[in-house]
Amino acid sequence: MDHKPLLQERPPAYNLEAGQGDYACGPHGYGAIPTAPPPPPYPYLVTGIPTSHPRVYNIHSRTVTRYPANSIVVVGGCPVCRVGVLEYCFTCLGIFLAIVLFPFGFLCCFALRKRRCPNCGAVFT
């Protein structure tokens, strides 16, 4: 393999004048971005004696009613310690009736359950 430099000639200069090089614009600006037309003149108001009365603004004050902050109520929260969440537990009588009266005993079992707080141990019927 030959180790020859890839470019034999020097690259073109960056400061090209009009009419030189492949990418330069022609003498008439062919390919150049046209300039935008100037914006229309701003309509100025004629100063003089005002023909209408000055505006009057009425400022009305409103009364602001402040409500107390809402308290967060946890559904199923313990009313005694306010930390634990109440869990359902079945009573011994409910479990006994569920076994003895098999198909209909489940109704008795669910009717005889209690709510218990695992944090403070309070029991609610």
Swiss-Prot record:
High expression in cerebral cortex, and in cerebellar cortex. This is Membrane protein BRI3. One of its GO terms (molecular function) is identical protein binding. It is a multi-pass membrane protein. Belongs to the BRI3 family. Induction: Up-regulated during TNF-mediated inflammation and immunity. Participates in tumor necrosis factor-alpha (TNF)-induced cell death. May be a target of Wnt/beta-catenin signaling in the liver. Its main location: membrane. It comes from the Eukaryota. The lineage of its organism: Eukaryota, Metazoa, Chordata, Craniata, Vertebrata. Interacts with BRI3BP. Interacts with MGAT1 and IFITM3. It is found in: Lysosome membrane; Cytoplasm, Perinuclear region. The chain crosses the membrane at residues 71-91, 92-112. InterPro entries: BRI3. GO terms for cellular component: lysosomal membrane; perinuclear region of cytoplasm.
